[in-house]
Amino acid sequence: MKWVTRARPKVDRVACPWLIKRFVDPQAEFLYVPPDQVMDVANREGAIPFDVPDVELGHHGAKCSFDAIIKKYNLADRPLQRLALIVRGADTAAKDLTFESAGLEAIAEGFRLVYRDDHELLEREFPVYDALYAYCSF
């Protein structure tokens, strides 16, 4: 399945692909495009849009796209619920939601500065989410 979102990912646009690959669609292909092209590419490619305004898998109220994916795909795994709080705090204005959120935001911004290619950024940053998931499993 193809999934599409805005280019130059930050917290949610890396956390969501990690979540999708690990728990929803192991063969997922991610397309990163300019913001004004997301819906056109979604329609043309039959891709699922995420982390863009006015889509099912986007921000709703105080919750981020990571939360929307967990809800849609009924991912009730307790460590994922804990990780969702960390991601939400790092990706939204609720920076004090968890102690870990500010650190995740800083790490994610560092990855954006080091890696200019969006797909390489995903590949390099996924182990951070694997480690956070393990941490949340304790």
Model-derived segments and spans:
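Conserved, aromatic- and glycine-enriched, well-ordered alpha/beta core segments
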Residues: K2-R6, R13-N74, R78-L80
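Active-site-proximal structural scaffolding
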Residues: D12-R13, L122
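A charged, amphipathic interaction segment
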Residues: K71-F138
